[in-house]
Amino acid sequence: MSKDNNQLVVETEFPVRYAETDAMGIVHHASYLVYFEVGRCQFMRDIGSDYAHIEADGCRLPVTELKVRLVGSLSFGERVKIRTWVEDNRSRQLTFAYEVIHPDTGAILVSGFTKHVWTDKHGNVIRAPKYWSSLLEKLPN
């Protein structure tokens, strides 16, 4: 991941919930995928869109690839801070990148990305909707 200092990075923060932890008392690795989705949804809202808007237009944005790199962990009751940005935007594909930050120390605990492809409601690959492209064009590069 190569975050550019001039691009929009959306930060989302919330507490770790008990159900997200495992028998060792730390956040289960699968929970980070949910955290990535929380960050992605907040990013969309912050730029003026969301999944409901995308789906109302007859489009879908399924995940086609993902990566999660864990170098630290969080426990129940600690706060999660997620940084989300668009890593790559192509006519038919979109990549979001993420960092899960320890809110007290600033340490990057988890990093990763999700790649998505634009489809119609039948699963056929399509170009990104024009409104989406125009929203991203307004963002800092």
Task: Mark where each language-model region is.
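Short glycine- and Lys/Arg-enriched binding-loop motifs that mark or flank ligand-binding interfaces
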Residues: 21, 35, 54, 73, ...
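Small beta-barrel nucleic-acid-binding modules, principally OB-folds
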Residues: 58-76
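Residue-level recognition of specific faces of alpha-helices
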Residues: 32-35, 62, 97
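Catalytic strand-loop segment that frames the active site of acyl-thioester-processing enzymes
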Residues: 1-43
